[in-house]
């Protein structure tokens, strides 16, 4: 909910996809402190989380949101198609990319006994991978794209080698969960 600049309190709603719940709970505390110092206002942040596509549909159908942080460009496009975001928003970003980033984190066993440091390590025969399915999870598509970008840089854009890299990576997948939250508990 918007407030005028003279108000000492402001409330915003962030509609986001499910795995970001804990991230934004922590980030909001940092933002609240920053906003108080910058604008002199106390900010209350309401979080709404669910599947990215469902959240996009909710916003397109009238759920009030000051900020949307969704998993996929197609979900943002659904909001654009409802007239809530300007056409051509992707042109503002390098390579017409999505206006959102995601950090990929490798969770390893305590002490990292297999010394996994980057994507190439996930291709070793002694490594098993647990990841969500990119056909069903927005976060998994970020994983896929991050692996592709790593291989693209490693192989100087040679698509044959990049595809072989991705194929080998997915051959090492032990659990291909339907969603990011499930993959973190597998």
Locate predicted features.
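Early extracytoplasmic/lumenal segment of secretory-pathway proteins
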Residues: 2-82, 92-93
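Second-shell loop/turn segments in exported
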Residues: 10-14, 58, 129-137, 170-175
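Extracytoplasmic/secreted envelope proteins and their assembly/folding machinery
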Residues: 21-28, 32, 52-56, 60, ...
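Sec/Tat-exported extracytoplasmic proteins
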Residues: 27, 31-39, 63, 72, ...
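Ligand-binding pocket segment of bilobal, Venus flytrap-like solute-binding proteins
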Residues: 154-186
């Amino acid at each position: 909910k918007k407030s005028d600049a003279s108000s000492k309190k402001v409330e915003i709603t962030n509609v986001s996809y499910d795995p970001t719940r804990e991230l934004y709970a922590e980030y909001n505390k940092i933002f609240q402190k920053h906003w108080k110092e910058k604008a002199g206002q106390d900010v209350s942040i309401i979080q709404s989380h669910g599947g990215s596509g469902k959240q996009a549909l909710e916003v397109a159908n009238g759920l009030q949101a000051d900020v949307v942080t969704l998993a996929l460009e197609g979900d943002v496009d659904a909001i654009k198609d409802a007239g809530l975001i300007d056409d051509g928003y992707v042109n503002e970003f390098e390579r017409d990319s999505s206006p959102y980033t995601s950090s990929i984190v490798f969770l390893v066993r305590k002490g990292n006994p297999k010394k996994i440091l980057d994507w190439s390590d996930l291709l070793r025969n002694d490594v098993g991978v647990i990841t969500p399915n990119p056909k069903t999870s927005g976060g998994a598509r970020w994983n896929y794209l991050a692996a592709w970008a790593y291989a693209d840089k490693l192989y100087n854009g040679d698509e044959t080698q990049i595809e072989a890299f991705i194929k080998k990576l997915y051959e090492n997948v032990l659990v291909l969960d339907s969603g990011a939250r499930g993959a973190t508990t597998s």
